[in-house]
Amino acid sequence: MPDFVIVLINLAFCLGAYLFGSINFSIIYSKFKKNDVRKLGSGNAGSTNVLRNFGVKIALVIFALDILKTYLASLLVYFVNLYAFKDSVVVFHAVAYCVVIGHIFPIWHKFKGGKGAASTLGYIISVNIIIAVIGAIVYLLIIIYWKRIVSFTTLITIPSLLPLMFIPWMSQLPLGFIAYQWPWWISPLVYVLIILLVIWSHHENISRMIKGQEKVIKWNKTSK
């Protein structure tokens, strides 16, 4: 297959991934409830703000859907490469990255979306679910036993997983079947770019944390 065709195919998949990532379930749900999550609480169109304003159950559903956006896009690329192209043509890392970009800057919602934490988790699972499990444990330990500030916990947890991405066999094991067909170093490289995106999306949270004004999470079990 000519190189320019491969480039065009990847660009098409990346565009589709961005548009898919731009589907924001937090906004869709809040619109269904005749509201706009971006006008409530922190103004963030993510599962944490949904938790504060609509309850635990729907927040967990949206969190799962945001994870699945990236993971399913990566899985689709894996099967397209396997059965349609019979070769590693579409770079799943780039597709996953574009899903995260779409989640943070959704074209369907005036480029104001979520912070990208859940969609980042979807990428991590695509590389190796072991890293995701370790990340979940770190996250829970921090938020339960140290600080109940979601943004702080996210900004600590996501970068802390980077060293694991640099372990070659993490993306070469059967559990990393989506990533194994690519050189191991691509996963940490793309992950660095995702970390930078997530940090930027939290710039307002960082400012509030410096001022001591960032909200502490409250576990509300009831839905509004």
From Swiss-Prot:
Q: What is the E.C. number?
A: 2.3.1.275
> Can you name the source organism?
Mycoplasmopsis pulmonis (strain UAB CTIP)
- Protein family membership: Belongs to the PlsY family.
Highest rank taxon of the organism: Bacteria
Job of this protein: Catalyzes the transfer of an acyl group from acyl-phosphate (acyl-PO(4)) to glycerol-3-phosphate (G3P) to form lysophosphatidic acid (LPA). This enzyme utilizes acyl-phosphate as fatty acyl donor, but not acyl-CoA or acyl-ACP.
Q: Which Pfam families match?
A: G3P_acyltransf (PF02660)
PANTHER family per the UniProt record, alphabetical = GLYCEROL-3-PHOSPHATE ACYLTRANSFERASE-RELATED, INNER MEMBRANE PROTEIN YGIH
Q: Which gene encodes it?
A: plsY
Bilayer topology reads: Multi-pass membrane protein
Among SMART domains, the record links this protein to: G3P_acyltransf
- Tell me what this protein is called: Glycerol-3-phosphate acyltransferase
Q: How does it assemble?
A: Probably interacts with PlsX.
Q: What chemistry does it catalyse, as a reaction equation?
A: an acyl phosphate + sn-glycerol 3-phosphate = a 1-acyl-sn-glycero-3-phosphate + phosphate
GO molecular function, a single term: acyl-phosphate glycerol-3-phosphate acyltransferase activity
